[in-house]
Amino acid sequence: MSKPKSETAPVAVNRRARFDYEIEETFEAGLMLMGSEVKSLREGRANIAESYVSAEREGLWLINADIPPYGPANRFNHEPKRHRKLLLKAKEIARLTGASTQQGRTIVALRLYFNGRGLAKLQIGLATGKKTVDKRQTIKDREWNKQKSRLMKNYG
């Protein structure tokens, strides 16, 4: 028997974002979705690996996120890669748009999940791009932690 999913189990995670960017601050944003998109998300079908957040038209928009069509919705289905509006407080939107205009800073999608009330939420992060040296250091740290855990398991 499979174990039950927790309420905040992620539907989609952008693992590449934490490797390519240094996340300075995270925010929780709501998503303006259609009904067929919500049903598709509840099935766990979404991909935010290549998505990003853009400040345009009086708000923040999630661009290039792939939510596949929901099968039973037939002709009333949504467009898989349409732009989706993010729901944040006005002060948060102003802060993020101001910060993202600075050189080298961007807003990335980190994970997509349902909160305790069953609402679809997107965790976004204000990020700065990492240089190649930083990425190599991240790989070294990860390998060292794996090696430490193996040593502790065998000799600990």
UniProtKB/Swiss-Prot annotation:
It comes from the Bacteria. It holds the Pfam family SmpB. GO terms for biological process: trans-translation. The keyword Cytoplasm applies. The keyword Endoplasmic reticulum does not apply. GO terms for molecular function: RNA binding. InterPro entries: SmpB, SsrA-bd_prot, SsrA-bd_prot_CS. GO terms for cellular component: cytosol. PROSITE patterns: SSRP. It is found in: Cytoplasm. Keywords: Cytoplasm, RNA-binding. NCBIfam families: PRK05422.1, smpB. Belongs to the SmpB family. Required for rescue of stalled ribosomes mediated by trans-translation. Binds to transfer-messenger RNA (tmRNA), required for stable association of tmRNA with ribosomes. tmRNA and SmpB together mimic tRNA shape, replacing the anticodon stem-loop with SmpB. tmRNA is encoded by the ssrA gene; the 2 termini fold to resemble tRNA(Ala) and it encodes a 'tag peptide', a short internal open reading frame. During trans-translation Ala-aminoacylated tmRNA acts like a tRNA, entering the A-site of stalled ribosomes, displacing the stalled mRNA. This is SsrA-binding protein. It comes from Maricaulis maris (strain MCS10). The lineage of its organism: Bacteria, Pseudomonadati, Pseudomonadota, Alphaproteobacteria, Maricaulales.
